[in-house]
């Protein structure tokens, strides 16, 4: 199958992923919602939040989804595919707000499978 995204049309982007506890808040708002809203206000075209069903972090404590838990402590990934300057803007925003988060920033090639998007 031919590659529909040539080097001339591929977008050089980064995948910026923040890892947030689902009950973590900032200014009385869930942090993942606050981060998505701030990205939108700053002209970022899109972002997504994904909730884990189980996770553990640097402290080694396993967190799992249980039916009876409300507002648990599982991980939310907030993911943006953005230009490097936009990633820097988001990271600066988080730093200015004194929010401590783990994140990854990975270079990716992105594009569309059809020229009629």
Protein language model regions, located:
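Positively charged, small/polar-rich N-terminal and surface patches that mediate targeting and assembly
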Residues: 1-117
């Amino acid at each position: 199958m031919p590659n529909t995204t040539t080097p001339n049309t591929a977008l050089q982007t980064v995948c910026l992923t923040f890892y947030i506890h689902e009950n973590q808040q900032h200014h009385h708002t869930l942090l993942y919602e606050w981060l998505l809203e701030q990205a939108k206000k700053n002209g970022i075209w899109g972002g997504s939040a994904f909730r884990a069903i189980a996770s553990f972090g640097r402290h080694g404590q396993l967190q799992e989804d249980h039916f009876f838990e409300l507002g648990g402590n599982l991980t939310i990934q907030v993911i943006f595919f953005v230009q490097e300057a936009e990633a820097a803007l988001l990271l600066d925003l988080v730093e200015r707000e004194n929010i401590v988060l783990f994140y990854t920033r990975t270079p990716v090639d992105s594009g569309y499978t059809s020229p009629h998007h």
